[in-house]
Amino acid sequence: MEPTKIVENLYLGNIQNGIRHSNYGFDKIINLTRFNNQYGIPTVWINIDDSESSDLYSHLQKVTTLIHDSIENGNKVLVHCQAGISRSATVVIAYIMRSKRYSLQDAFNFVKKKRSIIFPNAGFIKQLAQFERWLNSTNSYF
């Protein structure tokens, strides 16, 4: 499956898209798998399982800021996990919430419309709801 363009310079994909990054011209990769693949371009690795008990929330503020700063600097960013369905979708939804001031539901629908196969696990949905509360209470939007 090809990586999916979500907004200008932000793509959601799977591990194969990371491996073949040169085919797509990515400048930065956010890797959300258990494997610390070095792609030869700037890569951020968050070692996390696709499990309802995995803590992705503690990374959301930092990784959404990183995505925002990268895009602002004109970089083409790929966010990927193994299949491009749960972990990477969660991070991209969080970024859309923060950058567009969307609710969790609106951000989920926005990303789902672009990449119909997304399906964050129930634990990640709860963490996105927590992230939404943090955004609303701190006004920490871009």
UniProtKB/Swiss-Prot annotation:
Protein's recorded name: Putative tyrosine phosphatase 123R
UniProt cross-references to InterPro entries, sorted A to Z: Dual-sp_phosphatase_cat-dom, Prot-tyrosine_phosphatase-like, Tyr_Pase_AS, Tyr_Pase_dom, TYR_PHOSPHATASE_DUAL_dom
Which Gene3D superfamilies does the UniProt entry name for this protein?
Protein tyrosine phosphatase superfamily (3.90.190.10)
Q: Which residues form the Tyrosine-protein phosphatase domain?
A: 2-137
Q: Where is the signal peptide?
A: none
**Enzyme Commission identifier(s):** 3.1.3.-
Single Gene Ontology MF annotation: protein tyrosine/threonine phosphatase activity
Similarity annotation: Belongs to the protein-tyrosine phosphatase family.
Q: Source organism's superkingdom?
A: Viruses
